[in-house]
Each structure stands twice: as C-alpha cells, then as structure tokens.
C-alpha cells in the first residue's frame, strides 16, 4: 500500500491514476485484517470494548486525514502529498510488524476453543449472519448518503460560496467526531448488556436523529444533529463485529469478518449513489426521510432476528 500510494505521486495521466487507485483498493486490506485480528485475539468478554477502541482509531483517521490532505498540497504540492501518505503507511507497516504480537497456533483444537452453546445455535442460522452483514452495510449507507448533496443542502441553508467548502467539511467531520467520543463506551456497553440490545437501540436512535436533519434552518443545527448521529451510530459496527465473532466457529471467524468489511464497503458505495439519486429526482429533504426510514426498518428487522432466531439465554451476547 505504501508503494502504490507513492506511485500515485508519479502518475502520468488519468489512466495511471485510475489503475493505481484500483490497485490501492485491492491491496488495502489493513482495516479488514486489523478487525479480524482484534476480533479473534481479544477476550470474548472484552471484544466489544476492543473493537470500539479500534473503531475510534479508524474514525480519528477519517477525521484527521481529509484535514491534513487539504493542508499539505499548499506546502509540498499535490504529488508530494501522495509521497507523504506513502511514508505514513510505511511507518504504520513497520510499527505493526515490530510492535503487534499475534497469539496464533494452528494446532489448537478450535472446537474446544469456541464451540459453545452460543456458537452451535447461531452457526445453524445463516439468516443471522446475513442480517448482521446487511445491518453493517446500512450503517455506512446512512453515514455516506448525504455526501453528494451536502454542499447543495448547505447552500440552501444560507451559507455563502466562499465558506461552503469549510462548512461542509465541518458538518461531515461532526459525525466522525461524535463517533470518536462514544465508540469505546458503546462497545463496552455491548459487553455488559449484550450486543443485540445495543444494535437495536443504536439503530433506533440513529434513525430518529436522521429525520430532524431534514428540518434544519441553519448549518450549525445540521452539524449538531450529525454529531449526535455519530454518537449513536458508533455502537453499531463494534457490536456487529462482536456478534459475528461469537456467531461463527473460530475457524470461520476471519473469513466472516472479511465479509463484514465487504458489506461496509458496499454501504460506502451504495450510500452516495442512493443519496444522489433521491436528491436529484425527489428532493434533498427526502434523502434524510428515506435514510432514516431505512434505519428504523433495520432496527425492527434486527429485533425480529433477535427474538425469532436467538434463544433467551444467548441474547446477552
């Protein structure tokens, strides 16, 4: 990834840029592998908290990265920005190799490690996994749905063109900032009361904070609501990853957590497309109505799965 990012800095034309970005996407599996590693190495009773801390780090990067990326070109140029990005990735790679230790032993009997009553029941229901993957996609879809319309929507709120980019960046960053504040706490809450309850509660809260965003009259109101939405949405991905970790056999946990990452990437793709189509053909306010409605439907669907497919003695997982 460090090499590919640096090569983008010497791209000759658009074709080179597109191909290198494609390769970057193909080799950019660090996030997926880190979730798999934390999910499988952390103690089961602390998995929610550990994944919440990991989520906080990722969200901090999403918050700081665009700010640094917007600042560096004026100092080192656009191409130089890619070289610096490659160097940062190389530092992360060296730090991971030298500092991170994995307790992995292929000879361990995975059945003795993980085949508990919870695993046996949940593994028999692929519908549970499908529901979790769909929910993960919905989380990113909801968070990214306003990306194509944010500048137009903020313009309608009276923001001048000279401040438009800055205000749009603040509004989008508020969601990540709110998630940073609550992700570890909600992950720990999932360890205490059960991930299913956290998922259903966070979906309801996120849907309810999405709907009022259609009625704001000033950009700062939108920023506050996006921050609140970030605080509620933060508990979803750690809780989903925790459930996936508990639901499948140890031998399949890495593969299934990889599917979870693919579902999240799908949400990142579908969200902006859906938001753009609704905004262009129906209206800007309807983007929030549709997204909020989908989140509320997802909450009801997860509650149905929880009560229909999960027995009472394992709902605290």
Regions found by a protein language model. Give the residues of each.
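Helix-to-loop junctions at the C-terminal end of transmembrane segments
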Residues: 181-194
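Cytoplasmic helix-loop-helix junction between adjacent transmembrane helices
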Residues: 20-58, 242-243
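Helix-breaking motifs and short loop linkers at transmembrane-helix boundaries and internal kinks
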Residues: 10-15, 215-217
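Juxtamembrane intracellular "pre-TM" segments in multi-pass secondary transporters
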Residues: 101-132, 316-317
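Structural signature of the two symmetry-related core transmembrane helices
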Residues: 1-6, 86, 197-212
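Pair of pore-lining "gating" transmembrane helices in MFS-fold secondary transporters
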Residues: 126-145, 227
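Short amphipathic helix-loop junctions that connect adjacent transmembrane helices
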Residues: 149-166
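Paired small-residue
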Residues: 4, 15-23, 209, 220-228
């Amino acid at each position: 990834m460090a090499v590919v990012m640096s090569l983008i800095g010497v791209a000759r034309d658009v074709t080179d840029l597109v191909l290198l970005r494609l390769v970057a996407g193909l080799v950019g599996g660090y996030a997926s592998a880190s979730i798999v590693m934390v999910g499988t190495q952390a103690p089961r009773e602390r998995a929610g908290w550990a994944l919440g801390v990991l989520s906080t780090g990722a969200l901090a990067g999403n918050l700081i990265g665009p700010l640094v990326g917007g600042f560096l070109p004026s100092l080192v140029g656009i191409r130089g920005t890619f070289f610096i990005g490659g160097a940062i990735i190389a530092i992360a790679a060296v730090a991971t190799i030298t500092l991170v230790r994995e307790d992995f032993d292929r000879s361990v009997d995975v059945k003795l490690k993980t085949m508990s009553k919870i695993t046996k029941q949940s593994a028999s229901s692929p519908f549970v996994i499908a529901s979790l993957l769909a929910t993960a996609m919905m989380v990113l879809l909801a968070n990214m749905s306003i990306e194509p319309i944010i500048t137009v929507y903020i313009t309608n709120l009276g923001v001048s063109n000279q401040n438009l980019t800055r205000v749009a960046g603040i509004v989008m960053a508020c969601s990540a900032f709110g998630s940073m504040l609550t992700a570890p706490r909600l992950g720990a809450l999932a360890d205490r009361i059960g991930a299913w309850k956290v998922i259903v509660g966070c979906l309801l809260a996120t849907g309810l904070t999405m709907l009022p965003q259609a009625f704001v009259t000033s950009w700062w109101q939108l920023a506050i609501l996006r921050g609140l939405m970030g605080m509620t949405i933060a508990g979803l991905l750690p809780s989903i990853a925790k459930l996936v970790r508990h639901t499948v056999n140890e031998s399949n946990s890495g593969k299934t957590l990889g599917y979870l990452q693919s579902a999240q990437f799908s949400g990142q793709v579908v969200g902006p497309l859906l938001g753009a189509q609704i905004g262009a053909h129906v209206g800007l306010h309807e983007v929030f109505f549709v997204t909020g409605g989908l989140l509320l439907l997802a909450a009801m669907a997860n509650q149905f799965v929880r009560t229909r497919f999960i027995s009472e003695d394992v709902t605290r997982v």
